[in-house]
């Protein structure tokens, strides 16, 4: 017999983290919060594009930005500084190699910029977070693109394919979303509608059936 499990388990902390509490914990104010990351190794194209957005936020202060550049992206802070922003002098910028408190950071965010892996998308949906998705082109059967398009077609996210990714394109898309609160709220609602928050229970139920325990 075949067993097909499509649901990705969501960490309990993702389901319980609260926006206002998380912002307070992170020392954030009422300005829009952008969270961006490209995975634990980082992604060069994402880092290069995000550097433009981070540098501009450092100069004009319009957004608060949390960005993880990954283990191969240690050149990122230097790139931002070359664009005219001293990260150390900008209280609205939180730039680090890794995010080890993802539930808190994601809860605090108004917009998430990231890849389109299944687990990441499950967490975004569970929290109802609007997203700009940049699918990795280096995966089997282009599955991240298809993952992303499921959210785009549901009105829960926007997409920028890596071949089209530039700092200017990312800034345009970010501004278009964050300057439209009604659109953000609609994206949030649609994302949350897609959420499967009981994946652990579903998987447990299927496994029990396969093992003949029910």
What would you call each of these model-derived segments?
Residues 102-143:
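A donor-sugar binding/catalytic signature common to diverse glycosyltransferases
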Residues 166-179, 208:
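Two-component system phosphotransfer/interaction surface
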Residues 6-8, 134-137, 160-164:
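Short beta->alpha connector loops at strand-helix junctions that form conserved
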Residues 196-214:
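C-terminal alpha-helical cap of glycosyltransferases
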Residues 6-15, 39-43:
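Short beta-strand->alpha-helix junction loop in the catalytic core
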Residues 183-197:
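A short, well-ordered alpha-helix in the C-terminal region of glycosyltransferases
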Residues 19-24, 28-114, 145-149, 153, ...:
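Donor-nucleotide binding loops and adjacent catalytic segments primarily
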Residues 1-5:
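Short, small-residue-biased leader/transition segments that mark boundaries at the very start
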């Amino acid at each position: 017999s075949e067993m097909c499990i499509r649901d990705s388990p969501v960490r309990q902390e993702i389901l319980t983290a609260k926006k206002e509490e998380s912002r307070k914990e992170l020392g954030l104010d009422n300005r829009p919060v952008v969270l961006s990351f490209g995975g634990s190794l980082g992604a060069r194209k994402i880092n290069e594009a995000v550097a433009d957005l981070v540098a501009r936020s450092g100069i004009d202060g319009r957004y608060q930005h949390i960005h993880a550049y990954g283990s191969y992206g240690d050149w990122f802070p230097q790139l931002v500084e070359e664009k005219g922003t001293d990260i150390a002098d900008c209280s609205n910028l939180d730039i680090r190699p890794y995010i080890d408190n993802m539930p808190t950071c994601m809860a605090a965010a108004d917009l998430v910029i990231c890849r389109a892996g299944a687990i990441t998308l499950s967490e975004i949906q569970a929290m109802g977070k609007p997203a700009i998705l940049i699918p990795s082109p280096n995966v089997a059967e282009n599955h991240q693109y298809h993952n992303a398009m499921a959210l785009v077609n549901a009105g829960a996210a926007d997409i920028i394919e890596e071949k089209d990714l530039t700092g200017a394109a990312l800034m345009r898309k970010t501004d278009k979303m964050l300057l439209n609160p009604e659109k953000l709220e609609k994206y949030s609602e649609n994302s949350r509608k897609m959420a499967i928050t009981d994946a652990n229970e579903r998987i447990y139920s299927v496994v029990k059936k396969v093992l003949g325990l029910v």
